[in-house]
Each structure stands twice: as C-alpha cells, then as structure tokens.
Amino acid sequence: MKKLLSMALASTLLLGALTGCGFTDSSSQNPSGGGDDTSGGTRDTLVYYVSNEIRTLVPWGASDTQSFTILNNAFEGLYRLDANHEPQPALAESYTVSDDGLVYTFTLREGLQWSNGTPLTANDFVFSWLKQMSSDATNGYNFIMTDYVVNGLEYGEGTATADQVGVKALDDRTLEVTIKNPTPYFLYLTTLSMYFPLNEAYVTEQGENYGITADNMIYCGPYTITSYDPAVGTSMVKNETYWDAANVSIPKVEVKIIKDQSSALNTYLAGGLDKVNLSSADVPTYQNDPEFHTITEFRSTYLQFNLDDPAMSNLNIRKALGYAIDRSILADTILADGSTAAEGLVSFGVSGN
C-alpha cells in the first residue's frame, strides 16, 4: 500500500508498509520513529524524492532543505526529536544542567563509533561546533550557535580563542557546554544538523575533498551514503555501527530529485516512488483515496520588506499592504491545502502556539 500526502497540512500519498525506525525528512529531525509508523511488513528499500538539487553534503556549508534531509539521516546529534517533537537522548545518554541554567554537561553513550569504526568522542562535538561558529561556515546558520554558546560569536570574529569558547570535552564521553543565558529550549537546538559531530582527523585528512563524494565522508547516523550526485540524488544503506541500528527497519533508501510536481505524481502512480506530495489542485482528485493522508508541517510564509526602498520604509504603506491581504481567503481558497491563516511568524502547532 502506498500513501498520497498533501503538504501544508501536507496531503501525501505514501507507502504504508514501513515499521519501526526509518528514513526521516528534514522537518522531523528524528530518524528513529519520527516519521510515519504504519502496519505491514518491513520493506527493503524506500524510494523517496526531493524537489530540488541536493547542493552539498558538507555540514558547515548546507543551507537547503534537500541537503538537510540527507544529513539528518547520515548524522545525529546529542538529542533527537520523537514523534511528538520532544527531544530524546540520541548520541548523548543523559545530561545535567547547572542551577543557573547556563552549564549543560552531556554524557555520551558508551561505545559510539563512526561508520569506519573510529570511536566517536566528545572532542568530535567540540571540533564540529567550533567549525560551525568559525569563518569556515558558509551556510549562514552559525548564529544558531553563536547566539547561545559563550564566546561563540567572538570566536567567529577572531577576537576569542578556541579555549575561550563555551564548549569543552572533559573526557571522551563528557561534553560541557556553557551558554550565555538560560535557554529552556536548548535541548531542541542540539537536534539540529549544525550541532552534529564531525571527526577532526578525518575531516582534516580529506581537506577540500571532504563531502565532494560519498566516499569522502564518514557517518554517525542511522544511514551511510553510498552514492551522491547533486542533480540526480543519493543512495543510502543502514549504518551497522549506529548505536540504535537494531531499530532501523528500512535497510536501503533511494532519494531521487524530481523538480516537477506532476512528474513526481506520475512517477508515484507508476510505482516509482513510495511517497509524493500533492499540490492543492490534486487534492480533490485523491482526497478519498485510501492512500491519501494529511500531515501538519510547521512553517510560515511571509512578506519581507526592503526598508531601503522609499515606499517600503513608510510604516503606513507596510501596514496597508498587510491589511490588503485577506489571509483566510489566501489559505482557504487559493492554497486550499489545509493551510491556516497566520497571526504571527511562529507556526500553529509549534510548542507554545
């Protein structure tokens, strides 16, 4: 059985024979139970698709959804999100936090390994986090760390040294993180790909070749990448050295790049995909199909004004444009895909909203 998904509330046609831990998309961040868990036998290969090129496999260079989708399955962080979008232990088995909420001490699981058999240690997090906060990072997301980690911003600007930054390996299994201000959602941040570890010796050895091909990388997530072509897609297989490998139920994943939505739907209907997202125009055709499912995506769409423009610098003109858009009609009639009229930047369904 397959499934059709429409995506905003996302309607989708999606194969329904997946069990246990499997492949996750970029929004879930949880390859161990955050996706669809449906009845049926274990499948050998999941055939998935993304709608644009997978630009890079280099973690500190990735800024697109497609690259995040792959990295989220080939790597893992201290914590991961469960099916209810709550952080659960991943590479870390536990943590403590100081009374003032500023010092987190993470204890890594015993026996963690990279896909080449090299031990994974707290130093791998230190190296990776420093790389993400440095000028080497080209993905535009270093603020996700530098806004929180003590002296992270200064390190990136070259005014602080590595040993002054609030991330330290106390021993192979103990990572100490000092943040600037109490941050109740800090565990959520550690589920993001910017917080994933990297092996310093391997990255240094590969140099500029790191991430160019699947053979120039090692992995710590539920899957390893066996082939990669930015314009074609990737192939992935179960990572047998992954700490939770016993719960990875889908041995192989193929990720195709199909930019045209109608082509993706036709490929799905021909049996070439296990999941396809539907446009709002296709929803009426398939909404009564047993393969049709609707899921919620936490995202907002908004207008951003160029304040250097003389007209847009006028507050009243910006307000007038805001009042001129009927969000309810836009969501219910034009999009017609289950979207909700937004009242702010934080999406409905996000914790606290």
Q: What is the role of each PLM region?
A:
Residues 179-248, 252:
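Gly/Pro-rich hinge or "lid" segments in bacterial periplasmic/extracellular proteins
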